Amino acid sequence: MVNTETYTERASKHPSKVAQRLFQLMESKKTNLCASIDVPTTKEFLSLIDKLGPFICLVKTHIDIISDFSYEGTILPLIELSKKHNFMIFEDRKFADIGNTVKLQYTSGVYKISSWSDITNAHGVTGKGGVEGLKKGADETTNEPRGLLMLAELSSKGSLAYGEYTNKTIEIAKSDKEFVIGFIAQRDMGGHDQGFDWIIMTPGVGLDDKGDALGQQYRTVDEVISTGTDVIIVGRGLFGKGRDPEVEGKRYREAGWNAYLKKNGQLE
């Protein structure tokens, strides 16, 4: 059953400080749009985020794509933009290893993800040890609240993340009610009857395109929100060839917000 409560109502009783902040931010900015910024240079990365910042609740990064990455030159300006435009940061790292390894990948190395990313995500293939390792890493390296999304379903054609895999991933998510805040999925993942309020973030959302040559499949904003999505993740639809990021940012924000209002019965 799809959750029809408002973001404010959900924020008021959610056990996670990350989820509380995200819901409050979404309500205050009237947006459920996450911008996925996959570009190879820091200059383009920061420029796009600055343009899209007013329209988004979250920016999703693949930080290892950036060829000229440096903590001082890439991450510190990103943090400043997040303060300027009031959005949160989600590093789409898709951790998939044993607990100690993911802890080190999360906290150490070049990227030091736990120090700057509010939210990250993980596959369920290694069981709940991965969740425990990431939680321990967050606790040891930052006083800021951190949240984890589990990858329950993917938007790519031929994905193996469905059926029993999805069900097992949901069980892993139940192991930590505060740290695991939700899923990357295509629909509501349930859990309401057991007291879970998982945030559903959905990639592969498009107002114009149906797919690409590399197996991506797109669904409409209204379609995904009506089946339980809380946050729509949009990438090339915002800044692809011939698109104006500010025009598209406003367009997707309005589409996502109106779909949310319809779901909650606030808009006919």
Curated annotation (Swiss-Prot):
A Pfam family of this chain: OMPdecase
Provide this UniProt record's keywords sorted from A to Z: Decarboxylase, Lyase, Pyrimidine biosynthesis
| Enzyme category, top tier | lyase
Cite the active-site annotation. Answer: K94 (proton donor)
What reactions does this protein catalyze?
A: orotidine 5'-phosphate + H(+) = UMP + CO2
Q: Which GO terms describe its biological process?
A: 'de novo' pyrimidine nucleobase biosynthetic process; 'de novo' UMP biosynthetic process
Lineage: superkingdom: Eukaryota
CDD domains referenced in this protein's UniProt entry, alphabetically: OMP_decarboxylase_like (cd04725)
Residue ranges spanning the membrane: these are none
For this protein, what is the EC number? Answer: 4.1.1.23
Q: Which SMART domains match?
A: OMPdecase
Of the GO CC terms on this record, one is: cytosol
What the entry lists under InterPro entries is as follows: Aldolase_TIM, OMPdecase, OMPdecase_AS, OMPdeCOase_dom, RibuloseP-bd_barrel
Q: Which residues bind substrate?
A: 38, 60-62, 92-101, 218, 236
Query: What pathway does the UniProt record associate with this protein?
Result: Pyrimidine metabolism; UMP biosynthesis via de novo pathway; UMP from orotate: step 2/2
Q: Name one GO molecular function term.
A: orotidine-5'-phosphate decarboxylase activity
Q: Which PANTHER family match?
A: OROTIDINE 5'-PHOSPHATE DECARBOXYLASE
* Family of the protein in this entry: Belongs to the OMP decarboxylase family.
Protein name as annotated: Orotidine 5'-phosphate decarboxylase
Q: Which organism is it from?
A: Candida tropicalis
